[in-house]
Swiss-Prot record:
<dbReference type="InterPro" id="IPR020628">
    <property type="entry name" value="Formate_THF_ligase_CS"/>
</dbReference>
<comment type="pathway">
    <text>One-carbon metabolism; tetrahydrofolate interconversion.</text>
</comment>
<dbReference type="GO" id="GO:0035999">
    <property type="term" value="P:tetrahydrofolate interconversion"/>
</dbReference>
<dbReference type="Pfam" id="PF01268">
    <property type="entry name" value="FTHFS"/>
</dbReference>
<comment type="similarity">
    <text>Belongs to the formate--tetrahydrofolate ligase family.</text>
</comment>
<keyword id="KW-0436">Ligase</keyword>
<dbReference type="InterPro" id="IPR027417">
    <property type="entry name" value="P-loop_NTPase"/>
</dbReference>
<keyword id="KW-0547">Nucleotide-binding</keyword>
<dbReference type="GO" id="GO:0004329">
    <property type="term" value="F:formate-tetrahydrofolate ligase activity"/>
</dbReference>
<feature type="binding site">
    <location>
        <begin position="65"/>
        <end position="72"/>
    </location>
    <ligand>
        <name>ATP</name>
    </ligand>
</feature>
<protein>
    <recommendedName>
        <fullName>Formate--tetrahydrofolate ligase</fullName>
        <ecNumber>6.3.4.3</ecNumber>
    </recommendedName>
</protein>
<dbReference type="GO" id="GO:0005524">
    <property type="term" value="F:ATP binding"/>
</dbReference>
<keyword id="KW-0067">ATP-binding</keyword>
<keyword id="KW-0554">One-carbon metabolism</keyword>
<dbReference type="InterPro" id="IPR000559">
    <property type="entry name" value="Formate_THF_ligase"/>
</dbReference>
Length: 582
């Protein structure tokens, strides 16, 4: 079989003008970026306001292996399958970060015959939104350090007298705003800045600093959750970057940098329109990771797609304990729209990996032995799929299971898995998906089951309500969302929680950063564990995004590269074509 990039290059594509017209957009509602990309103006929603909303289909998964189980392939394949059924459909996915593209997972355009194209344009830079996020974020960092420098160098009274500005009196030890970059670089997790020659302060004042990956920036979450430019601007102004000497928050508005940050992000609030290999219009917008952020594409992209099509197919990062939980408890609340149907992607290899019979860790190749028939491992790993089915039903949303088939899969085991699902819950429809090998043709059954599920009545139930305390919200996600029996707050996290509640941030949502490789915070614990504790080591306030960010276990907000990163496979041929991207 051809590689993903070869399939993409050998498939004729329509110009983006044709795709935009197919989606129902007017020429003045988008700006082309080359032949196959366009920025869609959010203002088109004013014209579409009276259109009835379509159905929102959210794709999630079992607890994945480090290489993923094919959510994006299934998302794109399902959208193409719905088109095969003559349904009006659009897909919405996140913009890939170059961190994973050059790191372990590679690209995020789908694969095989279920891709967004051109895949190299999607995976590398796209229309520059992540670079804009990085620039706007680091502008706030520069503004903060500049203000700190001038106030401390001159003294507060002299600074106020000279500038006419009120001294912010920044507590250096309280600075929470790290810098960001769109690469995996563990060496930047902890750094010192403001270093000078002896006796000089020309470079600023020395302090500890660190970098997060751009996908973890609060600005990325804000772009994904903002409804329009006005909302974007207001949210940016609420970002807390530090505290003053009295413990009061200092915001980007206080630094008078929020307006410039919004200017930097003016174009980034517009989703990018592309197409699948079968010509399904696809909106790509925002790229928050689900393990260290809220893991869903933007509300604006969803709203445009829901107004233009009968079905909008989107995905949430990692398993249903990760991006799906945050879609239900953060995104749905901000958008006032919950999914009408959820597709849970499962694979034979993923379930066997959850059996505890295999040791799969990031950077390791998937062993061929995992594809050999192993009924005991399949049955043991099935507990994980049961967990995710029950988890989706907990929110009152109909679920459909898609078994993403690999070429090496054993037919007997595929049948056995379907039997296990039917025996567990006869009301849950299950379809074999061959989206990778066959595109939309390989998801016809899945697409029909999704159409049927979308006609069912939903009884959406988030895990917590806005009025509950932050402590109650954290407990709800850990206990009801993960199945933990206890939440263990560090001394630091306990102090931070009390501080946030004292400052009046009690009504914010909670976003827990944890490993995606287990329902627990320990990546080595597989299956459907019970009776575990969730350790919360630190809280971060994301007042602009609208949530408190809890770091659990040993999760890092700046990933590192493996010993054999994906960038080793990338190069250019003599004609300038990219090779080795997958």
């Amino acid at each position: 079989m051809q590689s993903d990039i070869e399939i993409c290059r050998n498939t004729p594509l329509s110009s983006i003008d044709v795709i935009a017209e197919k989606a129902g957009l007017l020429p003045e509602e988008f700006d082309t970026h080359g032949k196959y990309k366009a920025k869609v103006h959010p203002k088109c929603l004013a014209r579409l306001n009276d259109n009835q909303n379509g159905k929102l289909v959210l794709v999630t998964a079992i607890t994945p292996t480090p290489l993923g189980e094919g959510k994006t392939v299934t998302t794109i394949g399902l959208a193409q399958g719905l088109a095969k059924l003559k349904q009006s459909v659009m897909a919405c996915i996140r913009q890939p970060s170059m961190g994973p593209v050059f790191g372990i997972k590679g690209g995020a355009a789908g694969g095989g015959y279920s891709q967004v194209a051109p895949m190299e344009e999607l995976n590398l830079h796209l229309t520059g939104d992540i670079h804009a996020v990085t620039a706007a974020h680091n502008l706030a960092s520069a503004a903060l350090d500049a203000r700190l420098f001038h106030e401390q160098r001159e003294g507060y009274d002299a600074f106020e007298a000279r500038t006419g500005l009120k001294a912010l009196k920044i507590d250096v030890e309280s600075i929470t705003w790290k810098r960001v970059m769109d690469h995996n670089d563990r060496a930047l997790r902890m750094v010192k800045i403001g270093l000078n020659e002896h006796g000089k302060t020309i470079n600023g004042f020395e302090r500890n600093e660190g970098f997060d990956i751009s996908a973890a920036s609060e600005l990325m979450a804000i772009i994904a959750l903002a409804k329009n430019l006005k909302d974007l601007r207001q949210r940016i102004g609420k970002i807390v970057v530090a505290y003053d000497l009295d413990g009061q928050p200092i915001t980007t508005e206080d630094l008078q940098v929020a307006g410039a940050m919004a200017v930097t992000l003016k174009e980034a609030i517009a989703p990018t329109l592309m197409q699948t290999l079968e010509g399904v219009p696809t909106l790509i917008h925002a790229g928050p990771f689900a393990n260290i952020a809220h893991g869903n594409s933007s509300i604006i992209a969803d709203e445009i797609a829901l107004k233009l099509s009968r079905y909008t197919v989107t995905e949430a990062g990692f398993g249903s304990d990760m991006g799906f939980e945050k879609a239900c408890n953060i995104k749905a609340a901000a958008a006032n729209k919950a999914p009408d149907c959820v597709v849970i992607v499962a694979t034979l290899r993923g379930l066997k990996a959850n059996s505890g019979h295999y040791d799969l860790r990031p950077g390791m190749a998937i062993p061929d032995s995992i594809f050999s028939p192993d009924q005991a491992a399949l049955v043991a790993g099935f507990e994980n799929l049961k967990w995710h089915i029950k988890n989706v039903h907990k929110y009152g949303i109909p679920a459909v299971v898609a078994i993403n088939q690999f070429p090496q899969d054993c037919e007997q085991e595929l049948t056995a898995l379907q039997d296990l699902i039917h025996a567990f819950d006869p009301n849950v429809k299950v379809a074999i998906s061959t989206a990778f090998a066959q595109g939309g043709e390989g998801t016809r059954d899945l697409a029909q089951y999704v159409v049927d599920a979308c006609e069912k009545t939903t009884n959406f139930r988030p895990l917590y309500q806005k009025h509950q305390s932050l402590q109650e919200k954290l407990m709800s996600v850990c206990e009801a969302g993960y199945g933990a029996t206890n939440v263990e707050m560090s001394e630091l996290a306990t102090k931070q929680l009390a501080h946030f509640e004292k400052l009046g941030f009690n009504e914010l949502a909670v976003c827990i950063a944890k490993t995606p490789l287990s329902v627990t915070t320990d990546s080595s614990v597989k299956g459907a564990p019970v009776g575990f504790t969730v350790p919360i080591r630190e809280l971060r306030l994301c007042a602009g995004a609208g949530f408190v960010y809890a770091l659990s276990g040993s999760v890092m907000t700046m990933p590192g590269l493996p010993d054999k990163p994906a960038f080793m496979n990338l190069d250019l041929d003599e004609d300038g074509n990219i090779i080795g991207l997958s």
